[in-house]
Design a protein with these regions (language model features):
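Membrane-interfacial, low-structure loops and terminal tails that flank and connect transmembrane helices
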Residues: 1-2, 61-71
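Structural motif marking the loop-to-transmembrane transition
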Residues: 2-9, 71, 239, 243, ...
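Membrane-embedded alpha-helical segments of integral membrane proteins
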Residues: 8-62
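Short hydrophobic alpha-helical membrane-anchoring segments
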Residues: 21-28, 86-94
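Internal/C-terminal transmembrane anchor helices
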Residues: 69-93
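A structural signal for short, hydrophobic/glycine-enriched beta-strand patches
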Residues: 88-246, 259
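Short, low-complexity, Pro/Ser/Thr/Gly-rich segments in the mature regions of secreted, periplasmic
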Residues: 251-259
């Protein structure tokens, strides 16, 4: 009886975890209309977990019947291996992402601020976090210049770079310290075109990339690929969007790796 009660409690706890997780991944959609692979996969995983827990006796019977056949054992084995490898892979990526997020620049260098969404002609909250991080660094290091990097989306009235330039000036950064790269549409283009601007202005290849922490590991990998000697300066992320962005980044890093 006690064992049965403990099992029910454990299943109840897991269902609550799944419901809470679903709510966490739903937040970006309800707050800002954000729906991407990060929260889609997150919500799907939570629904799957809840379904498996609720139907656990049936799941056990189904798997038990399946493993009685050779083909069934093969299917169960393959699914188990994929699941274990997936968990390990996500754990490895998360460890590397955390490491890149926590690292701080050792020496002053030109900043490259990576753009993100502009709402009309104003920076989004996420973009302002990057701008604030860059502004704090620039005001503390008066000799450092900055490249603001980001093109203009179809629903944006100005480029991400121009939005960042205006915001930096509003925060007391002199206009002659700001270089604008407003053609890019991806992290690869951000850093490729920014490197060209560094070369045009005789600023070498050393740089400090400013982005949100979850994105830093991938951004630095891309920077290395285009020939920049880069370090990272992580901006904070809003708690309600971080889990979604984190899961999305797993897919982004993996796809970048597959592309070489």
């Amino acid at each position: 009886m006690r064992t049965l009660t403990l099992r029910r409690v454990a299943r109840g706890v897991l269902v609550l975890v799944a419901v809470y997780g679903f709510w966490v991944f739903l937040q970006p959609l309800t707050i800002a209309g954000i729906l991407n692979v990060g929260n889609a996969v997150g919500m799907g995983a939570c629904v799957l977990l809840a379904g498996v827990v609720v139907a656990w006796p049936r799941v056990v019977r189904f798997v038990s019947a399946l493993v009685k056949r050779r083909s069934g054992r093969l299917v169960v084995g393959v699914v188990a291996v994929i699941a274990v490898l997936g968990v390990v892979w996500c754990g490895v990526l998360s460890a590397r992402m955390v490491g890149a997020m926590r690292a701080e620049p050792e020496e002053p260098a030109t900043l490259i601020v990576l753009g993100c969404k502009v709402e009309g002609d104003r920076p989004s909250v996420a973009l302002l976090r990057r701008v604030d991080t860059a502004a704090d660094y620039l005001l503390a290091h008066p000799s450092v210049q900055v490249v603001v990097s980001g093109g203009q989306g179809a629903d944006e009235l100005i480029s991400e770079a121009e939005a960042m330039r205006r915001a930096l000036v509003d925060r007391g950064v002199a206009e002659d310290r700001i270089l604008v790269e407003d053609r890019s549409t991806s992290t690869l283009e951000n850093l490729t075109f920014s490197k060209e601007i560094l070369a045009e202005n005789g600023l070498g290849t050393s740089a400090i990339v400013v982005s949100e922490g979850y994105h830093m590991y991938r951004a630095l990998r891309v920077a290395d690929r285009v020939g920049l000697d880069a370090e990272g300066l992580a901006a904070p992320s809003a708690a309600w969007v971080l889990p979604t962005s984190w899961v999305r980044e797993w897919f982004g890093i993996t796809l970048d790796g597959l592309k070489g």
